[in-house]
Structures are given as structure tokens and as C-alpha cells.
Amino acid sequence: MNIPRRKLLALLVLAVATPALGQQRKAKQRVVIQVSDNDPAKWTLALNNARNIQSDLGKENVDIEIVAFGPGLEMMKSESKVADRLAAAIDANINLLACQNTMQNTKVDKSDIYGGVKFVPAGVTHIMKRQREGWAYLRP
């Protein structure tokens, strides 16, 4: 069997490229959502956006972070008006991140924040880092 070099090269390229294309399709989507308003309606919108993204793409196909800083940190407190929604978000593997700069400046202790919330040194910087890493950015 005599296969011309061009056909052999084309088959080789196809064999190597096909698995790579499959891996690209399976790559997880990543989105970081900013909430910097002390407004239950904005928080509800952000949480709804996160759940809708999971519903559309599949929970296993997307990483979601909601970063709260400035006045938005108030909604991450244990007694906030959206505390029940925070619990549902955490249960759905949505990462809730509180800005420690805001906490320090407003004298909020980690014990004041809803259980399951994680902490980042600086919310704005964390969002910038995620954008550099290729994460999609939303601000409802």
C-alpha cells in the first residue's frame, strides 16, 4: 500500500488535532460576578444569574465566583436578607468570596460573615486577576 506523503501528513495532522478539539469543547467555563451594592435586589439578580448559568451550561461545566466588596459585603453577613439564598448558592457549588480589605475598613469580623463564604485579600484585585486568567466578568 503506497500512501502519498500529502495524504499521510493530512491524516497525521487530523489524528493529532481531533483529540485537542475535543478537549477544547470540554473545557470548563469560568465566570466571576461582582456585587458591590448593599441591595437585596442586586444580590438576588447575581444569584439568579449564577444559577441560570449553571442550568444552561451544566453545573459540572462551569466555575462561578461571586465576589463581594464595598457596600456589597453587607449581604454576606449572617443576618442578611439573602442569607437563605447564600446557603443555596454554596450548596450549588457557587463560590462566595468576601473582600478582607472591606472587612478591615468596616470592622467586620469573619464570624459576622455567613458560614461557607470564603475570603480574598482584595475583592477588586481578585476580579482583575480572574479577568487576566480568562474568566468572564459580570456585574448585574
Outline where the language-model segments fall.
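Secreted/extracellular ectodomain signature
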Residues: L21-P140
